[in-house]
Amino acid sequence: MTAPNSTPASSRKRVRRRRQDKPALSAKLVLDAHVKGDVGVIATDLFADLFPHLWANGDSQDTVHVAIAPWAPSQTPEANNWSIVPVIRSSTVAPSTVQFSPSSLALQSFATHLQQAAPSKLSGHNKGGIEILILDVSPIELDTVFVNLDGELAKRLEDGEGTFFREHPVNGKGKARADATPEEHLTAALRTALGTLKIVHSGDFFPLPLPPHPVTHQPPNPGRITLCEPVAQGILAPTTKIIVSRVRTSKTKRSSASGQQQGRKLNGVAEDDEDAYFSAAEEDRDSKTNAQTAETDADDTEFEPQAGEDEDNLSDDSLDEIISLQVPTLPTTVTGQSTIGTGTPTMLRGRKTNGPGSVISSYTATTARPDRPRGRLFKAHGLMKPIPPDLLHPKPTPEDDEEACIYVDMRDLTRVGCFSGDWIRVEAASEPPSNGLGAFGLGSFVEQEADEINWRPARVFGLPEGYSSRSATRSHHSRHDSRNSSFFEAQSQKSNPPAYTSPILLANLDNPPYLRLSPIKRPSSSIIKGVAAQSKTSSTLKPPFAREVILQHVRTPTAVERDVQSAVMAGLKHYFERRLRVLRTGDLIAVPIDTQLGKALQESTIPGEDSAIDEVLGLIAATRPGQSLHYDDVAWFRVGHVQAMKQDTTEAVDGEEAEDLWGGIACVDISLTHLEQSGSVTGRIPGTISNSWQYYLGIRKLPKHQQNPGLPAQLQTLEPEKQYVSSLRRKLRELMAAATSKPALHLNLPPLAILLVSTQRHIGKAATAMQACSDIGLHTFAIDAYDIVNDGGGGGGSDVKTAGFLTSRAERAMSCGPESCVLLVRHIEALTADRMVSSIKEILADARVLIATTTEVEKVPDGIRALFTHELEMSAPDEQEREGILSSILADRGIGLDHGVDLSGIALKTAALVAGDLVDVVDRALVAQRSRLEKLTAKATGSITFRDVQLAGGPAASGLTKQDFELAVDAARKNFADSIGAPKIPNVTWDDVGGLGNVKDAITETIQLPLERPELFAKGMKKRSGILFYGPPGTGKTLLAKAIATEYSLNFFSVKGPELLNMYIGESEANVRRVFQRARDARPCVVFFDELDSVAPKRGNQGDSGGVMDRIVSQLLAELDGMSGGEGGGGGVFVIGATNRPDLLDPALLRPGRFDKMLYLGVSDTHDKQVTIMEALTRKFTLHPTVSLRSVAERLPFTYTGADFYALCSDAMLKAVTRQATLVDTKIRELNAAAGPEGKQISTAYFFDHYATKEDISVMVTEQDFLDAHRELVPSVSAGELEHYEQVRAMFEGAKDKDKKKEGAGGDGNGVDGLESGNRNGMLAITMGDDGAGAESTKKDGKGKGKAADNEVNGAGEGKGKEGVSPFQESGGDEDEGLYD
């Protein structure tokens, strides 16, 4: 809505606020050619109801905006697709009417929604109007509009060919300058063209300001709006960005594309764009072809009885199944058992082409049956939500039972042989054979007993428009439309038409995969009366009323609680009061209840006032259904006995025929029927794996794609998409199904006891067990062991009380049936008393399935643990499991997603998070979405409300976006790091690490490759998951480890040596195990051992009394061996060690499979590398333009480590800050001196608020600051220490280069040159040593002079070397071969 720009100054009336909870109004949309332009006309009464705050202004003709949607029973903004259109009020319009021009561009979006919801309303001009829902709305200014434009037309607009004609303005608005650039020409033309749309909708077409073709006068192809941000529809603002995407249109499509804009009108022409729609009239012409598609085999085919023919003359042989083989020509005699030829005279039963012995038909097993199944075969589908009766025709009465109805497509009613609203026979059927034998399958000639057929009468209705699925592709038309085009097409498996019904009705029919629908069998007296009797029997007659009905309560864990009995009785009373229920003996009745409200009312009322509670609950359910009551459970009842009244009909000859006609069902009228509840029974309920009763009864929310009414053929009718099922849930389901099966009960097999173990909490053990029970229809009675221990109390005899409480609750669970109820004990580690072993044994003696969960399995007593037959471990979910869990959470809550959201990417970012953490991620994403929408409403101009954003629609407004999930994942990962004790990693990236190019490449090969390409390691190749950084202190070993964790989005564990030590025997090794277990739970992650030489020194050299360090090293070796395989839970865990004394490490740590990747981190040996490090450290500094880092680096020695460079840059920045502060203080003193002693003295804060310039605020580091810091800096590592580290490096790397052939360089040289040439790939290492000898000789002292030999260590160059290499280095020397070449 656009409020008036001017308000009279004299008007001091208080502005009325718009209601956000206003329900939508029903109105009619009339297309009137007399209405000109794109703005509609709204009736005065609608204007007064929608805009009461503007109604008081009098005769205001300002344009306002309303949101319209095709009429639907649900009037909430979230459940409909709304289109915002501009209107003005008029007193000449009929009440409750909105008029638009048939060619209005504003109705393009509404036409799309109407086509999906009710296509027939687009097929012709509806003079009575189109029923719509209408709401007031304020449009939002759009930030970005994405436009698709033909490339040639865009080029013409860039050339300035745009002319403004017809609906385009003729003034100069929007025209570009004469000297404008091509981009300005295009921008001006598009902004003018989009200006013709009063409201911009996603998917709208708009005319371009180009002249038509000079010869054909055909207008150019219109532009198309592909996307609007931040909402799907709004107004174009001057600040709106227009992004053009140029597409190429083929010549064959240009003619049709030019008429797309005119096709998207509501004047009787359906839109004809790339999403082609075919109306019912087109499909009627292909009804025979569509009938072929729906056939499965000859068993499922039946023709309608013709005039003068009895229904016994019907045959399953159909003309639709005739095979057309034209070439080569076959004899006219068709294969089959019949010997009657083409010259056979007319048979006794009349001229037929589909009977036995026909010249066209084959002799089949179906025709050989004495009493073949009658009716049409349909695929059974349970409804996700009841179909509103207002959409059905004929409209059912309010008392009709919706659970006794079946819905099929309108075109399938004729094949059943009935009309919409007739009573039919519904028979449970099995799946038809899929092999080539067809009706000749095994057992096809065996006659089935009539008593074995599970059937019942039900009313059939045609699916409302928009619900039925219709093919969107044209069928191939051949010359012989009634014949199959080939033999192989006739033999192919074809789908049956769907039939939708209540999942409760399907459960009472034993959940059959198929239903056979046929007209209800007429009594013998009705056959004489003919068609009139058939019509009367099918539609007019009703089942007999019940005289007495006995109900038995199905015991479930929730329904047996005393606190919810009042809610159960109130729900049962309401169930029979609002409908005439159709029941028969053995039926299940599902009564949804609100247990929370029932318990609250039970606690707040006086004992004995149960009748008042029933009345309150019944009144709430009757007056505000679905708004105040939030159903969270279902009470189940079974019909024990139904006694029907004698039916006074003329059709029935005797009682047996009447009973056979209705199959034992009866209508329950609470005013006539004696309803009695007698006792209770135990048994299973329908399993959710094959029944959708949880969605149908409102216990679970519908998935978002099911709640979208813009989806034809799938609007609350189809079953939900297949959700992710974990392997553990599937295994639990199989074990419980086997333990509770009839053979297991008959053979009295031992009970099933399962212990679910995990190392993390909130991983979903109990939820997985409950879901597995619900899948197969078992009840779950959950017990928390800590609650039992608390109820037992302290003091003497607490164990006896605890055991008593456990036994009593187990007995209550067994009252629901041992074969149909599972006892779930959570946190079983709390039951540590010895008496619990005997108590659990007693429970297992009566129960069939016992499931216990624990996160601390070592605390479970051995006696209790030995009672379990299965022990299953639930580990942290991997990437695919996390994606499945996320999709399940979103589906259960009915949350939609933006098109840009990729759940697999979110699953990758949520590594190490379990199910409970993923629920928290979704909750945080919802909070982020709410905050984003609130910011959008606050940012928008005018009176924009939160409901306006919802009405504007779009995936970003109605669902979660990628930004919402990013905020949620970041917050969840921070909380997860706190929960597992992982340190917070600073935001260290590769940019913060200067140089070390070869080290980065080696790290990428070790870590990134297994993460991004796991298929390379799928054939048994072991991953190299251990990296050892060694070198002088301050060279960036810890910084590099943090950068690895940040760059690859890994969790980071930092382990110090003293953290692992413990005074108790065995605890130090246990600490090592816990570290790696936490790493496996948090994978992918990095375990960083800083100062590894203190954690794992050489074994046998320590003087500790108990050999603690030796045991720690042994445990560390055992854990490292499990990391490289990846199959045993170690995949995704990378171990990084850092030390400056690798010679002190235990040699076993450096063998293959452990720390086999050794990377030396040294100092910079060239000024170029020093400049690279300084650039990384000063990338956030503001350097003076005259600063040259190279000139600074040339004055620095080669002994500076990374830490020294960090200190150098930090000191330089500090000196710059000090210098700038001194200058500011000098200016303040000068100002105070100029003001004099009597003037106002200014402070530092006042100076920065009023006098400071940009130069005073900015701090720029000069080259002199670096030089001053260099003079004061003392290197952290001396030249002698660097020489020692270089010797250590040569000792470790010498074995790797020993067998390589190098071209040595002769001559003498100093140690610096030799080390520089011996360094590999720019490794940051240099030794400022004395002039030394040349290449390594074979002497023991390692010194000598001469040319480098092929087998020498240091390769080309001269320097000091060392001959002795320990055996362990030679064994693992080839692992890093070629790394430093």
Swiss-Prot record:
Catalytic activity: ATP + H2O = ADP + phosphate + H(+)
Keyword Ligase: no
Keyword Cytoplasm attributed: yes
Protein's membrane topology: Peripheral membrane protein
InterPro entries in the cross-refs: AAA+_ATPase, AAA_ATPase_domain, ATPase_AAA_core, ATPase_AAA_CS, P-loop_NTPase, PEX6_4th_dom, RecA-like_PEX6_r2
Keywords of the record: ATP-binding, Cytoplasm, Hydrolase, Membrane, Nucleotide-binding, Peroxisome, Peroxisome biogenesis
GO molecular function per UniProt: ATP binding; ATP hydrolysis activity
Compositional bias of kind Basic and acidic residues: 1294-1305, 1337-1350
Annotated GO biological process: protein import into peroxisome matrix; protein unfolding
Region (Disordered): 1-23, 247-315, 333-374, 467-499, 1294-1381
Annotated gene: pex-6
UniProt family annotation: Belongs to the AAA ATPase family.
Compositional bias annotation for Acidic residues: 270-284, 296-315, 1372-1381
Localization of this protein: Cytoplasm, Cytosol; Peroxisome membrane
Subunit-level organization: Interacts with PEX1; forming the PEX1-PEX6 AAA ATPase complex, which is composed of a heterohexamer formed by a trimer of PEX1-PEX6 dimers.
Protein name (Swiss-Prot/TrEMBL): Peroxisomal ATPase PEX6
Main location: cytoplasm
